[in-house]
Amino acid sequence: MKAEPHLASETPHDKVSCVHAETCGGCPLIHLPYPEQLAEKRGRVVGALSRFPALELIYTSAVEAAKPIAHYRTRAKLMVGAEGAIGLYARGGGHQLVDIEHCQVLAPAIVNVVDYIRAMLRDQASALGKLGVQEQDGAIRAIDVREVIDEVGAPPKLLVTLVVSRDVDLEPCKRAAEALVSHVPEVAGVSVNFHDGQSPQVLGNKSTHLLGATSLFDLLGRTKHLATFGSFAQAHRGQALAIHNAVFEHLKQLGRLSELRVLDLYGGSGAFALALAAEGATVKLIESFAPAVEQARLAATKLKLTISTECADTADALKLAIARNEKHDAIIVNPPRRGVSPFAREAIAQLSPQSIIYVSCNPDTLARDLDHFTRLGYAAASIKPFDMIPLTEEVETLAILRKAQVPPPRTIHEDEDILVIEKAAYEPAVGSASTPLSLTSRVRSIPGMSEAICVTRVDLATSGLVVFVKRPDLLDAWTKALDSESARRIYIAVVRGITPQKGAITRELRDGSRVHAARTRYRRLAVSSGHSVLRVIPEQERQHQLRRHLAAVGHTVLGDERYGHAPTNRYFEEKNGLDRLFLHCVRVEFEHVRRGQKLIVEAPLPGELRGVLERTSGAGTLKFLESKNALGHGGSSSLPPTPDELHDRGSALDVSATPTIIDSRRSSPEAAGDGRASVIYTPPDADDKKVD
């Protein structure tokens, strides 16, 4: 049953061959020469940044190449299937497991222990009982193997985790642990992790140590830190060191390392914090995963280093740091794929460091966050990608942000009375003591606009058009004009599920002790990955009217924490970086007070929302919506236009008086008001089109 050692072979630096390449989904770029892989990864970073006007001119450096590109991975999370198959799911989706017996990217020591576990599971004489694979009435679901090297040139050691169902008998697990330690010299410790039922995550939140070491020092980056079962590890040792060196080179530009105060956010088990402490810096680590914080503290004690640690949610910890008036010269952020939360971004800027060092594993959320930091007064000084996981589409990026002037907002329309401004999500229209930077403060920074006043508003987590008057004496007249029945605001929303083609929702909404009549009209423009892209028009603009009405009929706005569907919101944040409402005020129409003409102003769909649509359904949905002029063009026009202008435009945002019929469809109990609801649907137009 003993597996033969699986040794690394010499591999040309620009090409790796694998017998599993056609079926395994683990290395999608393996067919490309290595220089082309690097070009594709740089293109991914450039493409993500180019969605945002504030970032599209930032230069992205060439990708730092990895050496080696084979047998480099320090950690493997592999699924276990029938007859002891161990590997990854096949490319193309689904749950067909590919038994990977000759993986070209795993470190040789990891390959050896995986081979032994495979042989052990297939050996009917092993007496493992219920530890057998789940598809054969056993309990094992997956394995997680971490390679640890504590000194340069030292032989590797392994920490092995067996992922099992919660009701498994631990005796067979203990026998398996004893067999692993006895037959595979590299195995230093074994634990069992209990999977959380139907969770898509490989690891559950509870583990039990079985045998051997509970943690080991690992040299990953510039110093050692403690590795334990299931803890995060950068995939490539050489690239981890390259990123650490680049971070330290930047910090040296701020002053002597021994004199710097550094805040390490999403600090994990202390890879950055411990390395900085070794240079004499004053370091504070914040991490929400308690076992990782404990490992950082223990490592600091063993290495005789001083670091401050705090186990807390990042945004909550930053609020306390602001209240304590903490001062930091630099802040390092190394978040998971979903990026930095909006409130954490605001708090980081309020702490006012000289520099923000952002290490990202997801170009899409990096671009989203850099766009927000730009509005908060931190501009990207450099963008450097690293090939952390060769042969895959993934790319690690180091962004250096420095203090800069807060830019003025984008003005879509300006005349003698008003400004129509494009507001970003999580930018308050009017400031407060806790959020002194606001859209109003940015508008008033424009020369000659010191008296500008906001007339219309949208929700904090909504983006889109906001109207300002230039002087206080204009406020009353323009407030009446924008509240009149002829004025209209049109939104683009993506909502959960597939709605009818057209409809109207009439429902009274309660505001404290008062009840208000309210009506919302919508039209489905497209379907994206099972969810509806809508043009939505509130007729009265009550508080949260669109969100409450759509929730009332069971089609909540994606990203709506208050009225929405929590599992769907979590999925879209984790998988697609949607950390806001998918709701954008794309168009405003009103009669100009001074000119008497109807003015139409549009703001294009922001980059983060375009990215979500592209990731969920490919470029087809975006192209279709753009062909219908449904996503806004970033300009203004007056009515009446010439007949030719009206014909050429043909926008899906134009509203026609289509006859309606009443449908007896029942409203959802998610309704956010107390009044009676009626739902009215219109027959679909002949040119209505669905894009899946």
Where do the language-model regions lie?
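Short hydrophobic/aromatic beta-strand or adjacent loop that forms the aromatic wall/cage
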Residues: 75, 394-399, 490, 583-586
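Short cysteine clusters
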Residues: 18, 24-27, 361, 541
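Short beta-strand segments enriched for Tyr within beta-sheet-rich domains
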Residues: 542-550
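RNA pseudouridine synthases
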Residues: 404-519, 526-529, 605-616, 624, ...
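Extended interfacial segments that mediate partner engagement and assembly in macromolecular machines
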Residues: 5-15, 23-130, 136, 155
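Residue-level signal for inorganic ion chemistry
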Residues: 27, 143, 190, 362, ...
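Pseudouridine synthases involved in rRNA/tRNA modification
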Residues: 405-409, 413-417, 427, 549-663, ...
